[in-house]
Amino acid sequence: MLTLIKLKIQNFGRFLSNMIMPNISIFIAWGMMNALFMPLGWQPNKTLEQLISPMIFYLLPILIGYTGGSLISGSRGGLIGSITTIGVITSTNIPMLLGAMISGPLGGWTIKYFDKKIENKVKNGFEMLVNNFSLAILGILLAIISFFTIGPFIEWVSYFLGTLIQIILSYNLLPLTSIIIEPAKIFFLNNVINHGIFSPLGIQDALDKNHSIFFLIESNPGPGLGLLIAWFFFGKGELSKSSGGAALIEFFGGIHEIYFPYVLIKPKLIIPLILGGMSGIFILVLLHGGLISTASPGSILSILAMTPKGLYFSNIISVACSFLVSFISSSILLKYDFNTIQKDSNYTVKQGKNSFNSKTSREDFNNFNFSKIKTIIVACDAGMGSSAMGASILRKKIKNANLNHISVLNMAINALPQDADLIITHQNLTNRAKDNAPFSQHISLKNFLNNHFYDNLVKKLVENMVFLYDNHTDSVNKYTQQKKDALFQLNEENIILNQYASNKEEAINIVGKHLVKQGYVKFDYIDSMLEREKMASTWLGESIALPHGTIEAKDSVLKTGIIFCQFPKGVRFGEDVDDIAYLVIGIAAKNNEHIMVVSNITNALDKKDTIQRLSHTTSIKEALSLLTMEKI
């Protein structure tokens, strides 16, 4: 029930946001003209000042009305929505942004209903006549209705909200709104709050004071920045490694969605966000800060651009204060959180990492059909921030894997096509994505920057390509079966138990020498393995490392081979102190013969119990049976 309610709220909020988002540049243009040409602006100009009022009183409401109508019924809905909005605009003396958000969709729904009723009932040759006159007549009727009803109603609502806001401000209660705003943002309602609520309120407020505090309540990047920096210094696991880059993206790029997964993995961190938001709003109220228009995206650069003359100090102090409060409180919670790592006598499991580990992803991927994937869409609420970054990461990995037949796009959830092959969304947005594209395959993730997720997805796509290639025709199947005995197969000689190494370089040397000893590679291949490790760690997570040579070392490979080495005391392979490998698998690949063997080993290592047994077994036969998934 709660999920359904949340989904309904998200859908409604998304609709409101979609009316505002396409017109953000108009808000910015209006704000910049305010900052330049108004009497308190940088270049006051009475002549050019006349351009400002028509934009806020006519242009913006009409565009919002058109956008709202077109969301319901295309261009016809947009046209009748614009006509209906004219009735709202002329009925009052205040900017009718809220009125346009009602009248536009009303016009769209009306024309959509009318078109459905007359479908297939208009005689040939009269379609254009009926379409044009029906839209004009219905538009006039709706404009009159909105003039006498919607306009006065919105004027009363605006007066009521204005009075309520004055009461809140007079009792200094505005900072308490963070208790609602910050948790709502985590559930991807940030665009709804900013563009559906605060933008209309801010514009009405800015007409009186030339700036408004409401433009900086949701868009303040300080609380999110403080949380991410705290993760960078005191966090554990994979998220701490990506938090530094995420902080830069959030602060300068204005993509607040990037810190949401950090809170979802540790819900207690919502407290620092609330405290940071409250402190920022308190400073704004105290120093009378605010912006001249919507700051979108919520970047420090956008905020500075929308800051009116004389308010830079108050706005910067507000952002800085919210950052410090969020950082200090987040650091305290993270530094003294001893539940991040659970240890037993034999095995170390990192909770934070397990939430985003490759094993979980592999298990999830087993239920999907990758045989006809040509288009992958990474989608988020607005289709511009977090999904764009996720798509960029996946696109690069797809290219590196030579999967040139697969294209990767980023898109807003409401714009998803019905026939998309595979759609990737945050787990909190997947239900909405399924509603928009019910016939597509959907995969959920918790963090758009999760490299392990994309690595495992690409691995599955590559495995599928190998499978399709091997099963393309019956003749290929027979040929593959005939050559099966000639391919590399894991045996007891390839399993080396009870090894010890003080560091990963020593471990790679041990594995490499066994590859040389068994005739798989030349001796210089070991140097290539060490060189490859310097480029990027071959640590896979889940106590496994997969060292191998560089592409240039192909000539040093005599034949395809794999060496499975067990290090019961572990060897640190990753950047984190807890990235300990107990199982080190060395690979020498002459061609693609190793892919199926590695795939089988990967499937065998899907279970925690299997990894733990392999890490401490003293029986080569048991290890071989576990790796090949055959009974002893």
Swiss-Prot record:
Question: Which Pfam families does the annotation name?
Answer: PTS_EIIA_2, PTS_EIIC, PTS_IIB
Question: Is Signal included in the keywords of this UniProt record?
Answer: no
List the active site. 380, 548
Sequence positions bearing Phosphohistidine: 548
GO cellular component: a single term: plasma membrane
Post-translational modification, briefly?
Answer: An intramolecular phosphotransfer takes places between His-548 and Cys-380.
Please state every residue range assigned to the domain named PTS EIIA type-2.
488-630
- In which compartments does the protein localize? Cell inner membrane
Transmembrane feature ranges:
24-45, 50-70, 134-155, 165-185, 273-292, 313-334
The molecular function terms of the Gene Ontology recorded here are:
kinase activity; protein-N(PI)-phosphohistidine-mannitol phosphotransferase system transmembrane transporter activity; protein-phosphocysteine-sugar phosphotransferase activity
Name the domain of life this protein comes from. Bacteria
Taking every annotated instance into account, which residue ranges of this chain make up the domain PTS EIIB type-2? 374-469
Q: How is it placed in the membrane, per its record?
A: Multi-pass membrane protein
The UniProt site entry described as Stabilizes the transition state in the phosphoryl transfer from HPr to EIIA is assigned to: 532
Modified positions (Phosphocysteine) are 380
- Description of what induces expression: Induced by mannitol. Repressed by MltR.
Instruction: Please list the reactions this protein catalyses.
Output: D-mannitol(out) + N(pros)-phospho-L-histidyl-[protein] = D-mannitol 1-phosphate(in) + L-histidyl-[protein]
Record remark: domains: The EIIC type-2 domain forms the PTS system translocation channel and contains the specific substrate-binding site.
Q: How does it assemble?
A: Homodimer.
PANTHER family annotated for this entry?
A: MANNITOL PERMEASE IIC COMPONENT, PTS SYSTEM MANNITOL-SPECIFIC EIICBA COMPONENT
Q: What does this protein do?
A: The phosphoenolpyruvate-dependent sugar phosphotransferase system (sugar PTS), a major carbohydrate active transport system, catalyzes the phosphorylation of incoming sugar substrates concomitantly with their translocation across the cell membrane. This system is involved in D-mannitol transport.
Its recorded name reads PTS system mannitol-specific EIICBA component
Q: Which organism is it from?
A: Buchnera aphidicola subsp. Acyrthosiphon pisum (strain APS) (Acyrthosiphon pisum symbiotic bacterium)
Q: In the UniProt record, what gene is named as encoding this protein? A: mtlA
